Design a protein with these regions (language model features):
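Negatively charged, low-complexity tracts enriched in Asp/Glu with abundant Ser/Thr
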Residues: 1-16
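Acidic, aromatic-enriched beta-alpha/helix-loop junctions
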Residues: 30-73
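Short, surface-exposed polybasic-aromatic patches that bind anionic ligands, especially phosphate groups
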Residues: 3-4, 24, 61-88
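Residue-identity detector for threonine
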Residues: 11-13, 46, 54, 88
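Generic intrinsically disordered, low-complexity segments enriched for polar/acidic and small residues
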Residues: 2, 25, 34-36, 56, ...
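Amphipathic, interaction-prone secondary-structure segments
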Residues: 12-37
C-alpha cells in the first residue's frame, strides 16, 4: 500500500496518547489552517494527552485516514466508530 498523502511522510502531526497506546481508535481528524494534521479519539484532551508523531506513523496506525487525505485546510472529519465512513 503506497502512502496516499501529498505531504511528506515525515510531516509532524498531533496524535492523542489514547490512540498511540492502542486504547482508542481515530474518530476525529482536523486539518488545521496552518497545515497541521490532528488525529484524536472522542475524549476530551489536555496538552499532556497529545504527542507529535509523523504523518506516516499515524497512517500506519490507521490506514483509513488515507480516505480523507484531501481534507481541505481548516476542515474536520469524524466518524462514530472505525467501521463507519468518515463525515465532513
Amino acid at each position: 500500500m503506497s502512502f496516499p498523502f501529498r505531504e511528506d511522510p515525515n510531516t509532524a502531526t498531533i496524535l492523542c496518547k489514547h490512540i498511540a497506546r492502542g486504547e482508542k481508535p481515530i474518530l476525529y481528524v482536523s486539518h488545521d489552517d496552518d497545515g497541521m494534521w490532528q488525529f484524536l479519539c472522542n475524549q476530551e484532551h489536555t496538552i499532556e494527552d497529545l504527542m507529535l508523531v509523523t504523518l506516516k506513523h499515524a497512517y500506519d496506525l490507521d490506514p483509513s485516514i488515507g480516505e480523507i487525505k484531501d481534507l481541505s485546510l481548516g476542515k474536520e472529519a469524524w466518524r462514530e466508530n472505525p467501521q463507519m465512513p468518515w463525515r465532513t
